UniProtKB/Swiss-Prot annotation:
Signal peptide from the UniProt entry: 1-24
Biological processes annotated in GO: chemical synaptic transmission; chloride transmembrane transport; gamma-aminobutyric acid signaling pathway
Phylogenetic placement of the source organism: Eukaryota, Metazoa, Chordata, Craniata, Vertebrata
Gene encoding the protein: Gabrd
Residue(s) carrying Phosphoserine: S390
Protein name as annotated: Gamma-aminobutyric acid receptor subunit delta
Species of provenance: Rattus norvegicus (Rat)
SUPFAM superfamilies: Neurotransmitter-gated ion-channel transmembrane pore, Nicotinic receptor ligand binding domain-like
Catalysis: reaction(s): chloride(in) = chloride(out)
Cysteine disulfide links: C164-C178
Record note on quaternary structure: Heteropentamer, formed by a combination of alpha (GABRA1-6), beta (GABRB1-3), gamma (GABRG1-3), delta (GABRD), epsilon (GABRE), rho (GABRR1-3), pi (GABRP) and theta (GABRQ) chains, each subunit exhibiting distinct physiological and pharmacological properties.
Length: 449
């Protein structure tokens, strides 16, 4: 009997379980299927009866006042090449539509985002946007709230790529001002008036943003009326924010390599003049590396006509690197010229001495012959004039031979002595660093003040 009881117990449990599950489902079905009404909810169908969403509130009367507020979620990308930035914002708009007011409760209604399609909305657009899109994951990122007096709060999440005119003359020591312009596309100031919300004293989220290349230093709000001859005046609200470029990454990636390349080119001043391959290869390598650095740095920038501060510094470094190569060419030319001049002096000096000796011997022989002929002529009582002329000509020729020796004290070449190559290197070791330091002081003072 006990064994039979234990066998029947599971069967009894299986029989009773469906009964409880069915009862639970019936309870849920009763709750869902019941015609439940909340007493304070307004009758939306009654509010929307006769509502014309194609016409603004109070048409024919004063313009609709629309309050705007912004909350910045992120600034994703800032491009100097395209002169644009990408920003994700929450745009809050608030206005009063008396057609939707209700008075039997003071509660604010939070409505489904699909209800937006039934309402009149301001046709706000971003004037300087290149592209924009709404977010719809997991549902459309829209919020709509209705207050008893008919005030509607409409909030949407937008990501937009916005144009920003940049002045890159001081790049990368520059500061840029970018704007986000909001305006009505079709309604003029006679139909709609925009103003910044009273709560918009600061932009939430903007002070917490961490950008890779920039720091947001300040921002401000402006309101103006844009006058179009063909359409009238349109209200425009603008957000201006200042961006200061972070210079640290550029000092590491551009300025420091340039300085090191210039310093590397000075190493050749301590290399011997005889080591021609070493000095030439070092000079050419630094010049080519500097060229590569200039090209790579300019690849991410727009091809603007303005000369940027980074370009100026690159060219300063390029001139110093190239000047170091030219210095070796000049020093090597002087060293080679001195060697050739010394070799020429060694060859011409014995020849000049031999010419002088020959002239002296010739002069002596000529003088002896003339003296002998003079003695004979005196005995005969006559002195021919051609003998005296030849005597003088031989004497003058001998003097010329003696005074026109190459390299004599009165020669022009003796006064134009070439500078020693080692002396040029010694001067370059001091002049190049001093000149580079002076140019850097002028450069940084001009672009940072």
């Amino acid at each position: 009997m006990d064994v039979l009881g234990w066998l029947l117990l599971p069967l009894l449990l299986l029989c009773t379980q469906p009964h409880h599950g069915a009862r639970a489902m019936n309870d849920i079905g009763d709750y869902v299927g019941s015609n439940l009404e909340i007493s304070w909810l307004p009758n939306l169908d009654g509010l929307m009866e006769g509502y014309a969403r194609n016409f603004r509130p109070g048409i024919g009367g004063p313009p609709v006042n629309v309050a705007l507020a912004l909350e910045v979620a992120s600034i994703d990308h800032i491009s100097e090449a395209n002169m644009e930035y990408t920003m994700t914002v929450f745009l809050h708009q608030s206005w009063r539509d008396s057609r939707l007011s209700y008075n039997h409760t003071n509660e604010t209604l939070g409505l489904d985002s699909r209800f937006v399609d039934k309402l009149w909305l301001p046709d706000t657009f971003i004037v300087n946007a290149k592209s924009a899109w709404f977010h719809d994951v997991t549902v459309e990122n829209k919020l709509i709230r209705l207050q008893p007096d008919g005030v509607i709060l409409y909030s949407i999440r937008i990501t937009s790529t916005v144009a920003c005119d940049m002045d890159l003359a001081k790049y990368p020591m520059d500061e840029q001002e970018c704007m986000l312009d909001l305006e009505s596309y079709g309604y003029s100031s006679e139909d709609i008036v925009y103003y910044w919300s009273e709560n918009q004293e600061q932009i939430h989220g903007l002070d917490r943003l961490q950008l890779a290349q920039f720091t947001i230093t300040s921002y401000r709000f402006t309101t103006e009326l844009m006058n179009f001859k063909s359409a009238g005046q349109f209200p425009r609200l603008s957000l201006h924010f200042q961006l200061r470029r972070n210079r640290g990454v550029y000092i590491i990636q551009s300025y420091m390599p340039s300085v090191l390349l210039v310093a590397m080119s000075w190493v050749s001043f301590w290399i011997s003049q005889a080591a021609v391959p070493a000095r030439v290869s070092l000079g050419i390598t630094t010049v080519l590396t500097m060229t590569t650095l200039m090209v790579s740095a300019r690849s991410s920038l727009p091809r603007a006509s303005a000369i940027k501060a980074l370009d100026v510094y690159f060219w300063i470094c390029y001139v110093f690197v190239f000047a170091a190569l030219v210095e070796y060419a000049f020093a090597h030319f002087n060293a080679d010229y001195r060697k050739k001049r010394k070799a020429k002096v060694k060859v011409t000096k014995p020849r000049a001495e031999m010419d002088v000796r020959n002239a002296i011997v010739l002069f002596s022989l000529s003088a002896a012959g003339v003296s002998q002929e003079l003695a004979i002529s005196r005995r005969q009582g006559r002195v021919p004039g051609n003998l005296m002329g030849s005597y003088r000509s031989v004497e003058v020729e001998a003097k010329k031979e003696g005074g026109s020796r190459p390299g004599g004290p009165g020669g022009i070449r003796s006064r134009l002595k070439p500078i020693d190559a080692d002396t040029i290197d010694i001067y370059a070791r001091a002049v190049f660093p001093a000149a580079f330091a002076a140019v850097n002081i002028i450069y940084w003072a001009a672009y940072t003040m």
